[in-house]
Amino acid sequence: MRYPIVIHKDPDSDYGVTVPDLPGCFSAGSTLDDAITQAEEAIACHLEGILLDEEPMPTPHSIEYHHQNPDYADGVWALVAVDLAKISGQSKRINITLPARLLSQMDQFAANRGETRSGLIAQATMEFIAAHREPTN
């Protein structure tokens, strides 16, 4: 899963990072590279909290979607890849059967986003459950 981040820098300060799709998820770094690295950790921790609280996983929007927001004007945009399979707790090996063409498409899609096959399956499953979850009282 790739989350867009926006990085701002004020004079005499570190780089500040905002994750628009994850309200309350912020980070900072002394350089742009450090800011992005710190954002990866902040996003992973934030998503881990969401998983532990059994809340729906927020689906990231495109940079273009957020670029329209004046709060993010003059920011530097980047995408941060997070492998949900690595943060979703203890993993369990499963055996599934899929059409070869679908498997090939999955692998290519995951590779293009710096994810694993397992991470893609976990992400797709969480998004599907979140989209089809019955409201609870």
Task: Tell where the protein language model's regions lie, with residue ranges.
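N-terminal segment of the canonical double-stranded RNA-binding domain
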Residues: 1-14, 18
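Short, charged, surface-exposed hinge/linker loops at domain edges
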Residues: 2, 44-96, 101-108, 119-123, ...
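Acidic/histidine-enriched, beta-strand-rich ligand/metal-binding domains
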Residues: 17, 35, 91-92, 126-128
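Short, proline-centered helix/strand-breaking motifs
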Residues: 20-23, 99
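A short, exposed loop/beta-hairpin motif centered on an aromatic-Gly-Thr core
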Residues: 23-33
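A short, charged, amphipathic alpha-helix used as a generic interaction element across diverse proteins
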Residues: 31-48
